[in-house]
Amino acid sequence: MMICLLWISVAILVVIHWIYKVNKDYNILAFFARRVQTKDGKPLDSLVPMIKGRTVFANCFDLLGKDTDQVFTHLRQLAKNSGDSYLQYSMGFSNFNVIDAHNAANILNHPNLITKGVIYNFLHPFLRTGVLTATEKKWHTRRSMLTRTFHLDILNQFQEIFIAESLKFVSQFQGQNEVVVSLKDRISRFTLNSICETAMGIKLDEMAEKGDRYRANFHIIDEGLTRRIVNPLYWDDCVYNMFTGHKYNAALKVVHEFSREIIAKRRVLLEEELENRRATQTADDDICVIRKKRFAMLDTLICAEKDGLIDDIGISEEVDTLMAEGYDTTSIGLVFGLMNMSLYAAEQELCYQEIQEHILDDLSNLNLSQLSKLNYLGYFIKETMRLYPSIPIMGRQTLQETELENGLILPKRSQINIHVFDIHRNPKYWESPEEFRPERFLPQNCLKRHPYAYIPFSAGQRNCIGQKYAMQEMKTLMVVILKHFKILPVIDPKSIVFQVGITLRFKNKIKVKLVRRNCV
């Protein structure tokens, strides 16, 4: 009996010793998350705040039971309480949460940190591995291929589409001198129409019903993604599909069918153009060589397929990615931009007077050159995106042990969360950060500020290739609306309930009142 107890005691001591030894390198209770080290061996908490978890399992279950709006509030509170970029251990990962510009600059420019975080894996059923979610060689190839499609010459040719869609937007209120507008649905229809006609070369006039179905099912997909983000139990594909995945998968089918139809229609149009050129004896065997007019992004992909640079699945990946990004993120910027126009009458008047100075009432000179003269409108939009960034959080992960400038050594598979929302409201860079002040973006004020204190389009290697496109689209719609209407407030911005998500989500119906200018 004594020998048996002795062996049990030895076994217990061995296990305790093993746990002690392993726990130096791994946070065992965080499901063996490998620990972050410091370059000079200093205590970790001397370099970065450590967030204590709700349970003994580190931060694994901090979000469990919280709604999407509660998670959003929780993240903002963590940033406020820590006062600096902070560290968590959760579900087998170390998580470095960045809320300062210096660390953001280091990470976004680090040559080994181009791979998106594991959360982006939840996007793979929707976007697969297009330019947003791809990494390493595939990302470099796709990025190079797509960047040329946002060249200034091509953006110039898109302007007539933005004007036409903007006029179509205001024509919805023809015959109405005053109207209260719920922005989200109407603006998202405008941005979807615009991205389809510019980047895809397809008008949605005859596909309006299918476009509405796309938007409705996009919303279902977005809700499904958000549900997975906040509930670690749903991180496993099998568990998620078993309990709540059928609705999500049905929505995926609808949006993928829509994008495939867009691709098929564009292929037909390109072939018809080739036939027309043959008929007029100006034909060349290669439609990609002879085409001199507007060159939609989808055309570039179809031509790259002919050269063996991409296949049909690759085209679908990029079409789904560009449609989602171009439709959703710009829509968010416009919703909050128009809301702010309604809230800040003096700033709205400055925008209007600037527009009147540079843009004719018939819009005949509403081109890129004239848009570039609307400096105050640009500051207004930038300040809107500071307070309400379309992408409130960006994720990266380490593929190997990585040393940062701040002295932290992140182990392989560490997750890095760059909280754009908090950087944009960090009092270190922004005086009275909650106040709306477009003059923050005057050139002399920007010079005093860290360049990575404002990153609504990301920055560094993986910055948004469509940021000029987005600014052009937002400016054009705002010009057309302000030419026709004065925008009055309906909603109190303090009542807005934000929700966590890949993009900035909110529960409220954000509304404004449009009053026709000749009736004011």
Curated annotation (Swiss-Prot):
Its cofactor is heme. It is found in: Endoplasmic reticulum membrane; Microsome membrane. Heme binds at residues 325, 464. Its main location: endoplasmic reticulum. Keywords: Endoplasmic reticulum, Heme, Iron, Membrane, Metal-binding, Microsome, Monooxygenase, Oxidoreductase. GO terms for molecular function: heme binding; iron ion binding; monooxygenase activity; oxidoreductase activity, acting on paired donors, with incorporation or reduction of molecular oxygen. This is Probable cytochrome P450 4p2. PROSITE patterns: CYTOCHROME_P450. It comes from Drosophila melanogaster. May be involved in the metabolism of insect hormones and in the breakdown of synthetic insecticides. InterPro entries: Cyt_P450, Cyt_P450_CS, Cyt_P450_E_grp-I, Cyt_P450_sf, Cytochrome_P450_Monoox. The gene is Cyp4p2. It holds the Pfam family p450. It comes from the Eukaryota. PANTHER family: CYTOCHROME P450 4P1-RELATED, CYTOCHROME P450 FAMILY 4. Belongs to the cytochrome P450 family. It is an enzyme of class 1 (oxidoreductase). It is a peripheral membrane protein. GO terms for cellular component: endoplasmic reticulum membrane.
